[in-house]
Amino acid sequence: MKKLLLIFLFSLVILQTACGFDYDDKEIESEEGLSTLYDRWRSHHSVPRSLNEREKRFNVFRHNVMHVHNTNKKNRSYKLKLNKFADLTINEFKNAYTGSNIKHHRMLQGPKRGSKQFMYDHENLSKLPSSVDWRKKGAVTEIKNQGKCGSCWAFSTVAAVEGINKIKTNKLVSLSEQELVDCDTKQNEGCNGGLMEIAFEFIKKNGGITTEDSYPYEGIDGKCDASKDNGVLVTIDGHEDVPENDENALLKAVANQPVSVAIDAGSSDFQFYSEGVFTGSCGTELNHGVAAVGYGSERGKKYWIVRNSWGAEWGEGGYIKIEREIDEPEGRCGIAMEASYPIKLSSSNPTPKDGDVKDEL
């Protein structure tokens, strides 16, 4: 019954999101129409803008409207929409929402430190399910929003830990990204980015991670509050890296649990993604941490189900379907380059110190 309710609520979020801000072609045929559209967009998204900024922002908005409009006229497997980022330049968008320069942090931290083992290596590709969706299995919490803090690495880490914890304990618990932002600072850099594998090892060495309720997200670099560690803890036993540049290996991992992945999200098509299988422009300059929570196919195109952390109004209720099995070994947007997942051996967690675990289902 709970799973049916979860699927219904997820479908409702997708429907509500799809019915968001829209426009008529006539509104973009004149300067006056575009100006009215911009004011309507600002009201819809409650975007605060000073009068002094309006002309500059309107110019950016006009450019983005035409990009969305012209892209949607083409016969592509995905669509764009005017979301909350519509009056940001691509550079402003990248600086604010894709600030985790994975390559930079990889150079600072050196080679990967995960186990050289890959526990799913033995899996037979031909026997894997044709599609997997961990949302429908109740292993994914509701979509979260990192805001203008470059903490995507923390959200990616937490999504993977929430998933394996549900799989092992049958309890879905929303965990604290802010604890990682504030406390995992020896090598990761809070709102200035980080690496998911480092965060997994922090959680292991720290004895676990606390809940979202105990240590709520603030979207800023704060001082580590050790007292908030006294709440419920979810533990892991380490992590493993998925063999890089190998989408088949990634498929084996995602078939078994949600996986942290890094991607290049710094394109206008990604900025305004709305629905469908994303085959748009993106490179391999990894700048954003997300989570692969499933895979499938649509009209003959294979895709990854990727959970983002930009709120439910972006994409398909906060998710994007990224094309799967392309010619390049790195995968679309570099999705196969930096994948890792947490290991959890036990089917239980430490006894709660303050009340019971809150099951999100």
Swiss-Prot record:
Q: What cellular component terms from Gene Ontology apply here?
A: endoplasmic reticulum
Q: Where is this motif: Prevents secretion from ER?
A: 358-361
MF terms (GO), sorted A to Z: cysteine-type peptidase activity
Subcellular localization, as worded in the UniProt entry: Endoplasmic reticulum
Cysteines engaged in disulfide bonds, as pairs: C149-C191, C183-C224, C282-C333
One Pfam match: Inhibitor_I29
Q: Does the keyword Disulfide bond apply?
A: yes
Which positions carry the propeptide annotation?
21-127
Q: Which SMART domains match?
A: Inhibitor_I29 (SM00848), Pept_C1 (SM00645)
Q: Where is the active site?
A: C152, H288, N308
Write the record's keywords in alphabetical order, separated by commas: Disulfide bond, Endoplasmic reticulum, Glycoprotein, Hydrolase, Protease, Signal, Thiol protease, Zymogen
Where does this chain mainly localize? Answer: endoplasmic reticulum
Enzyme Commission number(s) of this protein: 3.4.22.-
Using the record, list the residue span of the signal peptide; answer none if the entry has no such feature.
Answer: 1-20
According to its UniProt entry, the function of this protein is described as:
Involved in the final stage of developmental programmed cell death and in intercalation of new cells. Cleaves extensins, thus probably supporting the final cell collapse.
UniProt similarity note: Belongs to the peptidase C1 family.
| PANTHER family listed in its UniProt record | CYSTEINE PROTEASE FAMILY C1-RELATED (PTHR12411)
The name on file for this protein is KDEL-tailed cysteine endopeptidase CEP2
Please name the source species: Arabidopsis thaliana
